[in-house]
Regions:
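Short, surface-exposed glycine/acidic/tryptophan-bearing loops
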Residues: 66-114, 133-135
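Disulfide-stabilized extracellular recognition modules
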Residues: 111-163
């Protein structure tokens, strides 16, 4: 579900006290496609890959986007990387809580990549993530993106659904 960021060297003068906690994640509002957000670009690039695979385009879905955005923000705020939320939530339970009508969802998560293009490339290079992107049964997509001060700094979520 994503690799580690490039290794870095330790600071020349290590701090003598604990660093302050990471700032809260910034969570841009869930905007519909066409608004020029990173989420919009992930949707566009996902549909490019689906077209190459012979699948129809995914439609933007506000409920799936709310679920994906909340999960990305939670990972960024709480400095973890998992399909299971800190409260035990799953992709399906998050989607249903956000208003998706059934639990049939797929999810891709990524961390550390700084652009939509790099994130899509990571997913396309992973067979399990690629399978979600080119699963022609899916009809709708929600995308979440958040930045935080944690280990990976950039957290991405795709929530796929079928109606």
């Amino acid at each position: 579900s994503g690799g580690s960021p490039a290794p870095t060297t330790p600071p020349a003068n290590p701090p003598t006290q604990n660093p302050p906690p990471p700032p809260p994640a910034t969570t841009p509002p869930a905007n519909p496609p066409g608004s020029g957000t990173p989420q919009d670009e992930v949707l566009r690039l996902t549909n490019v890959e689906r077209q190459r695979a012979g699948c129809g385009p995914l439609a933007f879905d506000a409920s799936l986007t709310a679920a994906a955005q909340a999960h990305s923000a939670d990972m960024a705020t709480n400095n973890y990387f998992s399909h299971t939320g800190q409260n035990g939530s799953t992709a399906g339970s998050r989607a249903q809580a956000a208003g998706w009508p059934n639990g049939y969802v797929g999810e891709n998560i990524a961390a550390g990549s700084t652009t939509p293009a790099a994130t899509i490339q990571m997913w396309m290079n992973s067979s399990g993530h690629r399978a979600n992107i080119v699963n022609c049964a899916y009809t709708h997509l929600g995308v979440g993106y958040a930045q935080g001060g944690g280990t990976y700094r950039h957290y991405w979520t795709q929530a796929f659904g079928r109606r």
